[in-house]
Amino acid sequence: AGCEASGLMAWESDPTENTRPFQIKLAARNGVTAALLAQDGFGGPAEIFDRAHSPLNAFSRNPTAERLTHQIGETWDGLMELAIKPYPCVAFLHPGLDALLELVDENDISADDVETLTIRFPKSGIHCIEDNPLKSHSAPYVLPVTLARRQLEIDDLFFDARNDDPKIAELCKKVEVVADEAELESLFPDFYATEIVVRLADGRTLSRRKDIARGY
């Protein structure tokens, strides 16, 4: 019930990962519901953002209501900041997933073929993906699952694939997360530039770099 409060970030400590997508969908549902109710004449406090018990006061010590209407109808920053994710995980991992899937498809790589799987990521953002208990934010989990299954689905985050698939569990042990302090770091945070390096059992080493998180 607590996680139904708009803007609450408690999902960061939810090991089930159910509440993160749940909250986003609630926001979308509530916006549509409010519009439909208003269309049918449903009433409410007209000064919802101006009174003492406004949502702005509930979530901020220094609310600035004027930002809600600043240049409204002239600029579309809110819309331009929306993202359409091709993968149900943190956006930091998206360029790496694009690179990994290209290598997997081009070389027909399976979990059994891999000796090591390395991701190079900007040092300033690596804390988010290196050893994160949330599966959706963990490179050592997301990359092996995506390689083994050639896709990443929301159920892969709700249910731990390591418990059901020994090959994925073993592959997770072969992941190395490396902090880049040079070129990739210089592009962060405007770009989530990532390099993926896959060392195969046949002696080949394959690499691919992607700089852009598609949909952002």
Regions picked out by a protein language model, each given a short descriptive name:
Residues 1-9:
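Long, well-ordered core segments of solenoidal/helical folds
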Residues 11-30, 36-216:
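Terminal-appendage/accessory-domain detector
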